Amino acid sequence: MLRWLLLKLIRFYQVAISPWTPPSCIYTPTCSHYGYEAIKKYGALRGGWMTVKRIARCHPFARGGYDPVP
């Protein structure tokens, strides 16, 4: 149930909010796509924690680049 809710929230962000904001993620795939895939693969707790760590790494001073869900 929590997994479903988090996936719906991420999808809502991707469809309704993200198109209206300038691109700022320095990683490929984007942080929202990473979060969606991590939660889908690992569940709400582990995937959610992986997403939080990824978002914390996404800042202008990081190197960025290709960083897929393991």
UniProtKB/Swiss-Prot annotation:
| Cysteine pairings via disulfide bonds | none
**Ranges in a coiled coil:** none
What cellular-component terms does GO give this entry? plasma membrane
Where would you find the membrane-spanning parts of this chain? none
Q: Where in the cell is it found?
A: Cell membrane
Topology in membrane? Peripheral membrane protein
| Annotated PANTHER family | MEMBRANE PROTEIN INSERTION EFFICIENCY FACTOR-RELATED
A Pfam match: YidD
Q: Which SMART domains match?
A: Haemolytic
What family is this protein classified in? Belongs to the UPF0161 family.
InterPro entries, per the entry: Membr_insert_effic_factor_YidD
What task does this protein carry out? Could be involved in insertion of integral membrane proteins into the membrane.
From the broadest rank down, the organism's phylogenetic lineage runs: Bacteria, Bacillati, Chloroflexota, Chloroflexia, Chloroflexales
- What NCBIfam families does this protein's entry cite? membrane protein insertion efficiency factor YidD
Q: What is this protein called?
A: Putative membrane protein insertion efficiency factor
Q: Which UniProt keywords apply?
A: Cell membrane, Membrane
Chief localisation class: membrane
> Which HAMAP family does this chain map to?
UPF0161_YidD
